[in-house]
From Swiss-Prot:
One of its GO terms (molecular function) is proton-transporting ATP synthase activity, rotational mechanism. Its main location: plastid. One of its GO terms (biological process) is proton motive force-driven mitochondrial ATP synthesis. It comes from Nicotiana rustica (Aztec tobacco). PROSITE patterns: ATPASE_ALPHA_BETA. This is ATP synthase subunit beta, chloroplastic. Belongs to the ATPase alpha/beta chains family. F-type ATPases have 2 components, CF(1) - the catalytic core - and CF(0) - the membrane proton channel. CF(1) has five subunits: alpha(3), beta(3), gamma(1), delta(1), epsilon(1). CF(0) has four main subunits: a(1), b(1), b'(1) and c(9-12). The lineage of its organism: Eukaryota, Viridiplantae, Streptophyta, Embryophyta, Tracheophyta. NCBIfam families: atpD. Keywords: ATP synthesis, ATP-binding, CF(1), Chloroplast, Hydrogen ion transport, Ion transport, Membrane, Nucleotide-binding, Plastid, Thylakoid, Translocase, Transport. The gene is atpB. It comes from the Eukaryota.
Amino acid sequence: MRIDPTTSGSGVSTLEKKNPGRVVQIIGPVLDVAFPPGKMPNIYNALVVQGRDSVGQPINVACEVQQLLGNNRVRAVAMSATEGLTRGMEVIDTGAPISVPVGGATLGRIFNVLGAAVDNLGPVDTSTTSPIHRSAPAFIQLDTKLSIFETGIKVVDLLAPYRRGGKIGLFGGAGVGKTVLIMELINNIAKAHGGVSVFGGVGERTREGNDLYMEMKESGVINEENIAESKVALVYGQMNEPPGARMRVGLTALTMAEYFRDVNEQDVLLFIDNIFRFVQAGSEVSALLGRMPSAVGYQPTLSTEMGSLQERITSTKEGSITSIQAVYVPADDLTDPAPATTFAHLDATTVLSRGLAAKGIYPAVDPLDSTSTMLQPRIVGEEHYETAQRVKQTLQRYKELQDIIAILGLDELSEEDRLLVARARKIERFLSQPFFVAEVFTGSPGKYVGLAETIRGFQLILSGELDGLPEQAFYLVGNIDEATAKAMKLEMESNLKK
């Protein structure tokens, strides 16, 4: 952990004599600390517990003040394991919130919640730090210009386009491909836009965090030879961390992204995987602090905690932070308070469907459930809007006809409906796409499809020009020309078999 030089002089060493306290109670990750009268730390101040455990090993545990209890006591939440701590150990008030390194030196590195590098590449070469607790930008600083953020993923760009400087939610249950989609977005945006990304791994699997790091090194997003040329900083607070760390790691990642926006004046991508774990950690901490639970056992401060994080993610006149947040949906229930609270802050939602994943259509983005406030003619243009609406209408009609097809069969439909079903099935398959990050598993090279190409492809399917092509030709291809080439290849293979 860094100490913010602007607020705390030369760091912990000068504070030792000024404001030491003592641990008086430890309950799991929650510590009660007594301080001398008149020297109470502020809420959110970082405390450091120093001492030695039973075998003489040094202990250095950082905590964050959450409650002032009276009788010169505070209640703090630990950011790391509390094994080995005992009552009576010395606690130092740093006089400032947790502060983390920011700037170009963070790129290509992995940090924990305290801003300490955990990638075995040595200390971070920067003296610039920033506190993780800040207020959102003032209204007068905000930028209100509307523009699309092209991702190169067909289903996203056509049906639920992302806003530059907006907030996007990736909704889906376990195992439907949220993290793979996030990895593809980091890859595409780094390569196509030259953008800087910050990835906050909040309460997810350590294995996934490691896989993501290795994948980024392979794809060149993290440059091992010249680490300064990397395009992403990683901040991890994984499942095995105490709830305090998981609750604050999102703020650490956001603080790093804010520096790129406000000081370097860049457009930044902030990925949070998973925002539900941020809520879950807050719920654990709330219970440990003795607060009365609210609906479904969540913390009573759920909306406030979510708002304090989300309102800092915005576009200013200096730069923008576009945030893509994976949202685990408990039991696939979108009315659960955690995903429902998240919805209120989002400009677009990308909903992943278990049904599509079961069919083998990846990315398994549900074209009818996914939404975007950007899909308006005055923003995306008439051509894009009309194409998207016709695609949705075709898929909606196909969905309505599926019960009839299941009971009576395809032959009982009218000629017009049979044609519509054939086109809908082609559209459904054409919405799939091979990913760069999945090349290792599938053997198919990844494809980046520009928005103009995407619109052209779907217009050709809707117009009926490609009615003669088999539907499997549209599965896992990039643009429409590849689908046509695949159809010719399939026809040749079929003729050879005959």
